[in-house]
Amino acid sequence: MLSEINETFIDCDVEWWSDFENNLGELNIYSVAGEVAYENRPDLFSEHCDRTWNDAEIEVNNKLEVLFNDIIETFHEWILQLNKPTPELILDIHTQESLFLTFNYTKTLENLYGIDSKHILHIHGCIDDLEVGHSENFILGHGKDRDDILALNDDEEPNIPDGLSDEELQYYLEEFANRVELHEQLARDAAINQLHRLRKPVKEILASNLDFFENLDNIEYVHVYGFSFSKIDEPYMAKIAEKLSNVNWEISDYNNSNSQKIYHFLAKYHINNSTIISLEDILDKRQLKFDF
């Protein structure tokens, strides 16, 4: 499974896995489609040639559908096998009369902090969804739309020879535009569709959880812990900022690695009352750890 991921996405090192969801959208479409198209060229001399133009498209669809489904299933299995955290280190957080938005699929808030689940929104699903077979509520994906995918895989610009007449230039550009054969273009389109299928539907998620975001009027403090401010998940925080830009915000920054994104977010949404902290500043005396 891992070798298939490495082969398809290329350069799947530790850094790649650390930004797993975003990098799901980094698939080299043209490389995958080109390889499959090369192996599934239509036989122009066959009386059944017309039937083979879609072979590469079908193969790309099958290959990526299996790969992406395996990635999602493997991620589900990894979440399910996580051991429950042991209360050796917990954050000193205010839990009474608080609301919680979590991107964590586990039940740490419920099990370790004793928070009632009715005060928690697992925005991308909870481990319970997997345990009872409702994996459709368990959301994983990248944040790129079709334009982003196309831009990422944009073809090279034509290297136009010097001294061409207008007629020669037009012919050269037409030939350059038509250099991709039909069966390969169909394979590319299939790869784009499959990659777009793995996109996280943030707008739809926000719409289906609108009640949570519309009922924040009495909130006086916003505490943001362990959030990366990645492009893919920023819309959720932006929705909160639209209603609560005038209250006090406390945001954690791990090893000062996120400062630029945090300051950009604060400025963008006109949040003037803010404090940036390290999680070590609010740790209790015990240590939270996972046994893998």
In which residue ranges do the predicted regions lie?
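Active-site periphery "cap/insert" segments of enzyme catalytic domains
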Residues: 1-131, 207-225, 230-246, 251, ...
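Extended charged low-complexity segments that act as oligomerization/scaffolding linkers
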Residues: 1-18, 194-198, 275-292
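Noncatalytic linker/hinge segments flanking ATPase motor cores
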Residues: 6, 10-14, 141-150, 162-172, ...
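Functionally critical alpha/beta secondary-structure elements and their flanking flexible loops
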Residues: 22-25, 34, 114, 134-152, ...
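Short, solvent-exposed polar/charged micro-motifs at secondary-structure junctions
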Residues: 111, 131-133, 285-291
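Glycine-rich loops and low-complexity Gly/Arg-rich segments
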Residues: 125-128, 145-151, 247-250, 274-277
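Acidic, metal/cofactor-coordinating or nucleic-acid-engaging core segments within structured domains
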Residues: 146-213
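TerminUS-proximal long segments
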Residues: 239, 247-292
